[in-house]
Amino acid sequence: MKKTGILNSDISRVVADMGHMDWLGIGDAGTPVPKTTEKIDLAVSAGMPSFISVLKEVLKELQVQKIYVADEIKDSNPKQLENIKRILPDVEIKFIPHTQLKKNLSEAKAFIRTGEETPFSNVILESGVIF
């Protein structure tokens, strides 16, 4: 049995397979996931697990150089945006329309669905390199 880090075998596999500039999505329970993108469904109930708790765990194992966030989060969920900025202080944030973010998920290796039920709690992580 794995002792530390991400215990979910699907997330662990996807993170280990990420190359430079690959994309991984994490988001709320209502995010539509393209049929071409692997969906890793962690949602248990409303709010469980939270978007931020899953994001924090993934960031312990994945080097990220840029994130894509829906522009609408600025007005509709500024608290969540502040949470994202706080845990990714040195990572470039690119704001794009929510419709574009949803389309871009078709290019992601996978999407992790959380139990989050707050608007625009979605992010696409672009992997970096550790050297």
From Swiss-Prot:
GO terms under cellular component: cytosol
Taxonomy, superkingdom: Bacteria
SUPFAM superfamilies referenced in this protein's UniProt entry, alphabetically: RbsD-like
Keywords: Carbohydrate metabolism, Cytoplasm, Isomerase
Protein EC: 5.4.99.62
Active site, per annotation: H20 (proton donor)
Membrane-crossing residue ranges in chain numbering: none
Record-listed substrate binding positions: D28, H98, F120, S121, N122
Pfam families, A to Z: RbsD_FucU
Oligomer and partners: Homodecamer.
Listed HAMAP family: D_rib_pyranase (MF_01661)
Family assignment from sequence similarity: Belongs to the RbsD / FucU family. RbsD subfamily.
Protein function: Catalyzes the interconversion of beta-pyran and beta-furan forms of D-ribose.
Entry protein name: D-ribose pyranase
Organism field: Lactobacillus acidophilus (strain ATCC 700396 / NCK56 / N2 / NCFM)
